[in-house]
Amino acid sequence: MYVVAALYHFTRFADPDALRAPLRSIAEAGNVRGSLLLAPEGINGTIAGPRAGIDAVLAHIKGLPGCAGLEWKESTATAAPFGKLKVRLKTEIVSMGAPGLDPADVGTHVAPAEWNALISAPDVAVIDTRNAYEVEIGTFEGAVDPATESFRDFPAWWQANKHRFANQRIAMFCTGGIRCEKSTAYLKEQGVEEVFHLKGGILKYLEDVPEDQSLWQGGCFVFDERVAVGHGLAELPFDLCRACRHPISCEEKADLAFEEGVSCPRCMDVHSDADRARFRERQKQIALAKARGEAHLGAGD
C-alpha cells in the first residue's frame, strides 16, 4: 500500500534553488516518488511512497521558511502512482501567467462542512477553475464551467465574462485548493470584494462530506495513476489516454477509436499517422519493459 500526499503552500522563498537538492535527497532516501515544484511563491506537488518516507518529506517541508502551517491531503493507492521523482524550479507553483500576485491576499477559505450552504445561496456564483477535460467527468451541481484548456486561460476568461457576475458573491473550487486559491488572489486584484474558495479543494470535500449529503456529481480527476476518485477518495473506473492525457471511461475504451497508448475517441482525429506510429512504438517498449519486470522511465530530473 502506498501513501499519496497532495500538498501546496504559498509562502515567499528567497532562494528556492537552494532548497531543491536537500528536498530531493530526503525524498530519495525514503523511496518517495512524484513531483514537487519550488518557486519564489512557495511549493506544490503530489508524492507517493511508504509511510515513513512520506512522513520524512513532509517534516522536511514543514521546516522550510514559512511552511510551518503546511497542510496536505492523504489517500492510498494499491499500485505505485508515480514512476519517478521530479523536484523542479518554476516561476509559479501553479501557472496562471500572473507571477506578481500576492498569495497572502486571497479570498475567504470555506470548510467542506460549510460549502453546501454557501454554494446554495441565490446570490453566489460558483466557478470551477479546473480545465475542461477535468470538468467533463465531474463537478458541483450548478457550477459555471469556463471551458479552459489551461489554467493560464482563466484570466482572459474572467475578463471576457466578469460582467455576468456583477453584484454576486463568487465561490471557486479546484482539485486540491491551489488553483482556486490563486484565482481568488487574481479576482481580489481585479476588485472583487466577496470571493471564497473551498478549503482543501474537491479532494477534502469528497473525504469529509458523506455521499448522501454531497452536492458533487461524478468523479474528480487526479494527476496520477488513479486518474479519478469519488466520495471517500475511492478510485473510480477511469483510465488515461496516453496519447492525449485525458481521462477515458470504460465505455470510451470499448470504442473502436481506442487503442492502448495510441488513441481514444477524443484524440483519434487530432494526431497524425506519424504521431500514432510513434505512440505505438512507445507502447511496445512499455509492454516489453513490463514483461521484463522493469519500469519504463524517461531520464531522471
From Swiss-Prot:
Q: Which InterPro entries match?
A: Rhodanese-like_dom, Rhodanese-like_dom_sf, TrhO, TRHO_N
Q: Kindly list the residue ranges recorded as spanning the membrane.
A: none
Give the enzyme's EC designation: 1.14.-.-
Q: Name one GO molecular function term.
A: oxidoreductase activity, acting on paired donors, with incorporation or reduction of molecular oxygen
User: Which ranges carry the Rhodanese domain?
Assistant: 120-214
Pfam entry (one): Rhodanese
Q: Which reaction does it catalyse?
A: uridine(34) in tRNA + AH2 + O2 = 5-hydroxyuridine(34) in tRNA + A + H2O
Q: Where is the active site?
A: 174 (cysteine persulfide intermediate)
| SMART domains found in the cross-reference section | RHOD
The biological processes this protein is annotated with in GO are: tRNA modification
Q: Which residues form a coiled coil?
A: none
Instruction: Enumerate the CDD domains for this protein.
Output: RHOD_YceA (cd01518)
- Supply the alphabetized keyword list: Oxidoreductase, tRNA processing
Q: Tell me, what does this protein do in biology?
A: Catalyzes oxygen-dependent 5-hydroxyuridine (ho5U) modification at position 34 in tRNAs.
Write out the similarity annotation: Belongs to the TrhO family.
Alphabetized PANTHER family for the sequence: RHODANESE-LIKE DOMAIN-CONTAINING PROTEIN 7-RELATED (PTHR43268:SF3), THIOSULFATE SULFURTRANSFERASE/RHODANESE-LIKE DOMAIN-CONTAINING PROTEIN 2 (PTHR43268)
Q: Which NCBIfam families does UniProt cross-reference here?
A: PRK00142.1-4 (NF001136)
Could you tell me what this protein is called? tRNA uridine(34) hydroxylase
Lineage at the top is:
Bacteria, Pseudomonadati, Pseudomonadota, Alphaproteobacteria, Rhodobacterales
